[in-house]
Design a protein with these regions (language model features):
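Short, basic alpha-helical/linker "hinge" immediately adjacent to a nucleic-acid-recognition surface
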Residues: 2-7, 18, 27-81
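Mobile genetic element proteins and their domesticated derivatives, centered on retroelements
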Residues: 16, 41-44, 75, 101, ...
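Residues that mark the N-terminal boundary/hinge immediately upstream of a DNA-recognition element
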Residues: 25-26, 97
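Basic, flexible linker segments flanking DNA-binding modules
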Residues: 52-158, 232-238, 320-323
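Mobile-element integrase/transposase regions
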Residues: 111, 115, 122-180, 187-209, ...
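Acidic/histidine-rich, metal-coordinating catalytic segments
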Residues: 203-235, 260, 316
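Charged alpha-helix within mobile-element recombinases
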Residues: 236, 242-334
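C-terminal, beta-rich DNA-binding module of retroviral/retroelements integrases
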Residues: 300, 304-419
Length: 419
């Protein structure tokens, strides 16, 4: 049916609505006469009640104004800045990211669509046609609840072209919601860094059912790679790594990516993070680890709370929260396992020692008297590094309880104990 303002005058519609108010005509009769729906009917009725003297049904097309010279100039400047990054062979940036550029423009008050940016890019010669995609590993969500599978990995990159060294990005991502639960940059990849990531996830979100990781030696002992002995005594997975010991205590399973395609499923989030973070650091001349961490936090917030995920077609944080409300979560509340009184004895580095005949144990060439144990007795050491204080808290366990504790500087034991 033709538009309302082309079929009736404002006075005619006004008469019909007045008849409805007086009880002479029903809503259905007026809707049928005007050819409108319920929503449109009540919108017209509200307009008549609020502004009877200026009631109108005229249609006013609202077209977005053309971009002004200032906006066009900023778009051009940002595109040319991106072109410098793409042309720089020393940077791990091989193409344009128009969505990221649109977000940068929005911060400066320029609201423009990505399509418009692409049009301007073509005009300036700042455009690359997308390459034909190869067959990729299935990106579908393989879980039906949050906490069922946590994708966890680390990636080494030069996150800023102005930095003097590469840093490791460690992330934990919930498979169902695609929400990044943990993300941090560290100077070196250690068991302790991954243990801290697991601690953050478990204490802030709950204990997940299982982790999905690759075959890095931090996560898994593999014979023929991690042993120098040719006469094999221990096979693959016969030794639990420090990280896996923590997960075993919390009754969380681990599954491994057994193919390059499956491994790519974990590493895919690093692609967009690397691209956006490197671009931001290059454009802002950022070089320090703390500054890059700020860029990372901003990017994770945008991804979790503002961006619609291409696979789920939902914003990750909203999907995560909705799953919780609909009881689609297998996260278990964080509680200490039986026999433990402190989380320090869960999230720690474990080593074994045997006391001598004088109840002393040796660490980094130093002897320490341990009370509450027998001569020649085996004890377990729980080491908790504190890099800010440059010390390690050492908690000595025997008979399923802590019997002694002391602190040592990290510099005294970091050569004999690998965190």
């Amino acid at each position: 049916m033709a538009q309302l303002h082309k079929q009736f005058t404002a006075d005619q519609v006004k008469v019909l609505l007045t008849s409805y108010k007086q009880g002479h005509l029903s809503r259905e009769e007026i809707e049928q006469t005007l050819g409108i729906g319920k929503t449109r009917f009540f919108a017209l009725l509200k307009q008549l009640r609020d502004h009877p003297d200026t009631f109108s049904i005229d249609y006013h097309r609202q077209s977005r104004p053309r971009l002004g010279p200032e906006a066009e100039g900023k778009i051009q400047a940002e595109l040319l800045r991106d072109k410098e990054l793409v042309d720089n062979k020393d940077l791990p940036i091989s193409g344009y990211n128009y969505a990221a550029l649109t977000d940068r423009l929005k911060k400066t008050g320029i609201r423009v669509s990505t399509t418009t940016v692409i049009q301007r890019a073509k005009e300036l010669g700042c455009y690359q046609a997308k390459k034909k995609k190869k067959d990729q590993h299935d990106r579908a969500v393989v879980t039906s609840a949050t906490g069922d599978l946590i994708q966890h990995d680390a990636s080494l990159h030069l996150w800023s072209p102005y930095a003097n060294e590469k840093w490791i990005l460690i992330t934990s991502l919930d498979d169902y919601s695609r929400m990044v639960l943990y993300a941090d940059l560290v100077e070196s990849e250690t068991s302790w860094a991954h243990i801290q990531a697991a601690q953050y996830v478990m204490q802030n979100f709950g204990i997940p059912h299982q982790y999905y990781v690759d075959n890095l030696r931090v996560f898994r002992f593999i014979q023929n790679r991690d042993s120098v002995w040719r006469n094999h005594v221990l096979g693959t997975d016969d030794v639990n790594t420090q990280w896996r010991q923590v997960l075993a205590l919390m009754h969380t399973d681990v599954i491994y990516a057994l193919s390059p395609q499956a491994k790519g499923k974990i590493e895919r989030p690093y692609r967009w993070m690397q691209d956006r973070i490197v671009r931001s650091c290059a454009l802002e001349h950022i070089s320090s680890l703390q500054e890059v961490r700020s860029v990372l936090r901003e990017e994770i917030h945008r991804y979790n709370y503002l961006q619609v995920h291409s696979t789920t077609q939902e914003i990750p944080a909203i999907r995560f929260e909705k799953a919780k409300q609909e009881n689609k979560s297998v996260f278990r509340p964080f509680t200490l396992p039986q026999g433990f009184e402190s989380s320090k004895d869960i999230f720690c580095i474990r080593h074994s020692r045997v006391a001598d005949g004088y109840r002393k144990i040796s660490i980094a060439g130093q002897a320490f008297q341990i009370s509450g144990i027998e001569p020649r007795e085996a004890v377990e050491l729980h080491l908790i590094p504190d890099e800010a204080m440059n010390l390690v808290e050492i908690r000595v366990w025997a008979h399923k309880k802590m019997v002694h504790r002391f602190n040592l500087p990290i510099t005294e034991i970091d050569k004999v104990v690998h965190f």
